[in-house]
Amino acid sequence: MVAEDRISQLEDTSVKELTTVRLRPETKAYLQSQSETLGVSLSQVINMILDGVVSMEMKPASDNKIKGIYDRIMSLFELHNINTVDMAKMLSGYGIKLSHIRNPDKFIDILSMDMIKEIANWFSINYKWIIGETNELYSPRDNTWYKDSYGFSLLLLEKSFRHSDLKVSVVKANNVSFEKAEKLEEQYSRLYVGFILSYTSKVNGVSFTKYEVCEFQRWNYNKCRGYLRFIFYFLDSVRTRINCQGVSFNEEIVDGLMAGRLFPSTIKGMLSETWFIAERIGHIESNYDVEINPVEYLNRFNRLIRLFRF
């Protein structure tokens, strides 16, 4: 099945009408020579040329859409270091074989929306990105922590029991220091801090590293800072269970993560600096930047930490 037929069928149901075409002498001479060579009338040659032009204009749109879906799916597996043999294993439930993966047309013929959504779920990707309806790979807003540090910490703890190799990367931009961000006005020193989770996932016997990009918020804003400090307190208290590291990247990388335009797997080899979350906890008992009694909030965290230790 050709690509354009896979997307849509263009049917000519219009009534034919006579049309007068004015040709330059040299053009008419060329077309007449072609009509004699092909053994058809001049009008038929003109129709053939026009049909060919329309076909060439229409075909790339359909071909590019299909190729885009195929390429985006392939890129997801490649970025997670999954080869074609393992890819076929993961997709075997949909009847996908190695021969389908190596042939875009065969692959697209079997592709279904259910398969697209499952692939998206495997890699924490927005399925609409796969089909070309959005440029946003994922939404960091799907994993929020602002005003609910406890809920986010509980989520991390639950994930650590399901995935023993859970790693939490606390990401910030390296354009400004924490101290400077607290002192200067936000418009001059905006500093975003967020989280990337990574852990081993397994599908049909194939293991790969899965990434989740979580919410980014401003260290400049005292309330965001207050909730972040409670998360830092929790992570530092369970550091023997959950591997956590503070990392700094340039603003472009952080902006790309915040906007859902950058695959988190691609930042591993990029230049970064490390920092220690323990140095940013402060006097947690008097952390009045949260919209709750800090002592009561701290007690909830301590009970959670004790449960983990037992």
Language model region names:
Residues 150-299:
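Long, charge-rich C-terminal accessory regions
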Residues 1-26, 35-36:
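Short Lys/Arg-rich basic patches
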Residues 113-129:
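DNA major-groove recognition helix of helix-turn-helix/homeodomain DNA-binding modules
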Residues 14, 18, 91-111, 118-120:
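Recognition helix of helix-turn-helix/homeodomain-like DNA-binding domains
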Residues 6-10, 56-66:
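A detector for short, charged/polar N-terminal pre-domain segments
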Residues 133-157:
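Short, charged recognition helix plus adjacent turn
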Residues 37-41, 67-92:
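Short basic helix-loop element that most often maps to the first helix and adjoining turn
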Residues 40-62:
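Short, basic amphipathic alpha-helical segments that act as recognition/interaction helices
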